[in-house]
Amino acid sequence: MSHLDLSRIDLAFGSHLVVRQLSLQLEKGRIGCLLGPSGCGKTTVLRCIAGFERLAAGEIRLDGEVVSTPRHMLPPERRRIGMVFQDYALFPHLSVADNIGFGLRRDSAAVRNARVDELLALVGLAGQGRKYPHEMSGGQQQRVALARALAPKPSLLLLDEPFSNLDVELRERLSYEVREIIKAADTTAILVTHDQHEAFAVAD
């Protein structure tokens, strides 16, 4: 059984159909990719998977559970999905450690701190938890965003053009690093990109 299953989904804005009859299956632990030019509906598909947009037709299942149909939407907070955006979306007033631990506020301080330290090491930023986002480079900020998304151990990770704000050299290096991090975390993920090189560097 697929971990993520999109079955003949349609997505529309008003009367305008932006995605028609899309089907996709992704096995647990694999990294998939939606590759295409800007404006073709890739990000809209991610928003539908995350629970922010309603289907016009079809069905989405996550780990066997129906999470979206035209008449049913499981709320985003109950889907256990992590997201990484192209603009990092870090909280500027919080330290790196507090950004990463933001989704772990229900855990005890000891559990939260241990998880944050584990993730800082995983993304190659051990010992830098007290810094603030403005003190980090673009590549480091994107790693912090990835660590924050991975912190609650999501069932699925969605990456929406995560390297588009980085220069070409850093983008190429970070794409391989991100793949290694996702694999080390044993996480299922989908990358959205318009860049063929990124697609082949990150996805299975």
Please report, for each region that a protein language model flagged, where it lies by residue.
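The feature captures the beta-strand-to-loop junction immediately N-terminal to the Walker
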Residues: 35-37
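Hydrophobic anchor residue at the start of the ABC signature
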Residues: 146
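Short coil-to-helix segment of the ABC ATPase nucleotide-binding domain corresponding to the Q-loop/switch region
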Residues: 94-101
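Catalytic Walker B motif of ABC-type/P-loop ATPase nucleotide-binding domains
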Residues: 157-161
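Conserved ABC ATPase "signature" region
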Residues: 65-68, 110-128, 179-186
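Conserved signature/switch motifs of ABC ATPase nucleotide-binding domains
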Residues: 131-134, 152
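ABC ATPase NBD coupling module
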Residues: 66-82, 106-114
